[in-house]
Amino acid sequence: MTKNIHDQRILILDFGSQYTQLVARRVREIGVYCELWSWDVEEADIREFNPDGIILSGGPESVTEDNSPRAPQYVFDSGVPVLGVCYGMQTMAEQLGGKVSTSDEREFGYAAVKVSGESAIFKDLEATQDVWMSHGDKVVEIPAGFTKVGETDTCPYAAMANEEKKYYGVQFHPEVTHTKNGLQMLENFVLGVCGCERLWTSESIIEDAVARIKEQVGDDEVILGLSGGVDSSVVAMLVHRAIGDKLTCVFVDNGLLRLNEGQQVMDMFGDKFGLNIIKVDAEERFLKALEGKSDPEEKRKTIGHVFVDVFDEESKKLKNAKWLAQGTIYPDVIESAASKTGKAHVIKSHHNVGGLPDDMEMGLVEPLRELFKDEVRKIGLELGLPYEMLYRHPFPGPGLGVRVLGEIKKEYCDLLRRADAIFIEELHAADLYNKVSQAFTVFLPVRSVGVMGDGRKYDWVVSLRAVETIDFMTAHWAHLPYDFLGKVSNRIINEVNGISRVVYDISGKPPATIEWE
């Protein structure tokens, strides 16, 4: 490796926008490392990070309020390029001597920005740009040294620039896909203005991660809880590439997995990739612990506690394991820091954001803690994991434990597994699986009368659920074809003895959540 992939970096200061993580993902997509910190970060931390450029995010506050957040003064004293987005532009304008006012005309949705003059931020772009606006306040007077480089019919300063100091502000959101050339604008800033190179690629991330794992663990042995999910699977492949047979994976089959999932994990990681895997069949133990529990939160906690106990027991059998590998990813780190302090912080190493025992005397290996989920999937492909596994729909940590409503019984799980497998199989066959964001089946603990042949049956009900969403914060129910739903229903009722009725969930989020529990 000729250059360190972290040498060139962008700092993003978070003012609370729902899109802030998306800004970071776009910068990474461009091929440059970045980190996301709270707006009130200390000057010393910025100096230590030594960014090549700083982006000020959007946010829900109003710059016109006395106690609204401001960028640290050092941002404008540091000599590095700065891009303000939405609220970020407004606080930049106000802090540097311009004026912001609350507007009677709020701009939400698509807008056409008329580009004026020559600005690095709009390099190689046409004179009119389709963008996405989401603001009430607006800049009414730009600071000295700035020029107007974009306007809309209702926003006189939709973009401003101080080319000499390399300060730029845009009132719209270049990070969202609704802004047609938003990625190009961010590239113009990150690559053009800041002078960064595209060092952050899947290949270089893998090379860097493997080197760091080798340096961290040396000749020691490592243990990993392998679930078959995306994060733990990619960690397994990275650590195995770094240290080979010194990695031992523990796969706990809790009886709450999808149909044949346990065998699929063993076949792929054991037989195909040659990893050392200990499989623990703990179905009876989990179901016993869940007896009589119907509250969703109590079920989640019980499943988590039993997993920790089982994993702890297995890890103690591996006397030489000095390190624990975990699938912590960057959003986990951000959310963990925010939940403890109310704000996102600098990435600190060895912060256990999982629920494993505090007394587990092992060092932590977390090779994904700098990565977003989409980056994890990309390096998974590069490491040889199958697309179907990396891009399948989300599956909750407690598994079927929160898809069997109420008390969990083996009979219910077995029925649900088979019904869900039919639904997913038919989605693939109809080329609909990748057109919905998430699809699954829920077991309802209610019986319903049905007719089979000349006889009546009194059996269980399942609900099909399919949603379309961009960020899983909000979701629409998927309008699947009636013929398709009819086929799935017929197959489930005919092939799964014990189910007499199939319903389809047409609730959006909000008011409903995506999962039922």
Curated annotation (Swiss-Prot):
Reactions catalysed: XMP + L-glutamine + ATP + H2O = GMP + L-glutamate + AMP + diphosphate + 2 H(+)
Tell me if Metal-binding is a UniProt keyword of this record.
no
Q: Which GO terms describe its molecular function?
A: ATP binding; GMP synthase activity
Which residues bind ATP per the record?
227-233
GMPS ATP-PPase domain segment(s): 200-392
First-level EC class: ligase
Which InterPro entries does the entry link to?
Class_I_gatase-like (IPR029062), GATASE (IPR017926), GMP_synth_C (IPR001674), GMP_synth_GATase (IPR004739), GMP_synthase (IPR022955), GMPS_ATP_PPase_dom (IPR025777), NAD/GMP_synthase (IPR022310), Rossmann-like_a/b/a_fold (IPR014729)
Its biological purpose is as follows: Catalyzes the synthesis of GMP from XMP.
UniProt-listed HAMAP family? GMP_synthase
Q: What is this protein called?
A: GMP synthase [glutamine-hydrolyzing]
Q: Which organism is it from?
A: Vibrio vulnificus (strain YJ016)
User: What does UniProt list as this organism's lineage?
Assistant: Bacteria, Pseudomonadati, Pseudomonadota, Gammaproteobacteria, Vibrionales
